Amino acid sequence: MKKIFQFIGLFVLICFSFFYTEKAITVLNEQDPIMVEIENKKDYYYLKPIDATIKYNTIIPGIRGKEVNINKTYDNMKKIGFFNEKNIIYDDIKPSISLCDNYDKYIIRGNSIKNGIALLFIIKEDKYLDNLIKIAKDKDITVNLFITTDYLNNNISKLYKFTNTEIYNFAREGIYQKDLIILGNNIINRNAKNRSSYCLTKEMFTDTLNICSKNKMHTIYPSKIINSNFYSNIKSDITKGDIILLELTNNMLEELNTIIDFIKKKGINIIGLNELLNE
């Protein structure tokens, strides 16, 4: 019995020793000039998150905020011996209203803070595809290809060659069913550089929204759908955050270089959906 009490006493002593040591280290850290400066400046580097905008059955993504991770930043700066803002380590702050929690809404545009737009194209055959990819590469932009599952299934070996693109599932020409979603997504996720995260609809079909939502995919309803007079339509009305679906035709390709140059001159980036819609 005596040995048991001795063991318990030793255990309590060790626990107290650890607690006291940790407390002492915490006090010393709090008095360190580096820690003091981090505490004093953390509010300056705080970035408030912006909530997604929901109106009826539509959504515009928000923007994540960030805050200084005090302990990780302190450990990082302690290695160099002084405060340096380049060594600050941040934690993301998810918006209270977030795209990630709302699969049952149509994404109608990106957040204008991103200073970008997305160009979308539907692909169901090879026609014009090589020319489109060449223009995207030459102009150093990213285009978003919504590809039918038939084309995906018959052209798997080509996908890795699609530079300057993001690839998404267009199922059976926009008709989404569970088996087509699984097939198309598996092909894309295994062979493309991006994950298959989005469905595309030209009209607000509840069936599309429901089945894509059940499969944890967001549904995009473009800000603009342009089938003719491509340059004129874009020139007359373009804003940051636009998601523009362009019909892939010979006339469109003839105007695409001019369209890209016009958008760039306005200081707007032409980017992938992943970047435009990521909070």
Name every feature range the model reports, one short phrase each:
Residues 236:
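S-adenosylmethionine/decaboxylated-SAM
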Residues 117, 126-231, 240-243:
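Metal-dependent polysaccharide deacetylase catalytic core of the NodB/CE4 family, i.e.
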Residues 1-119, 134-143, 239-279:
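Terminal accessory/targeting
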Residues 105-106, 230-233:
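A generic local structural motif
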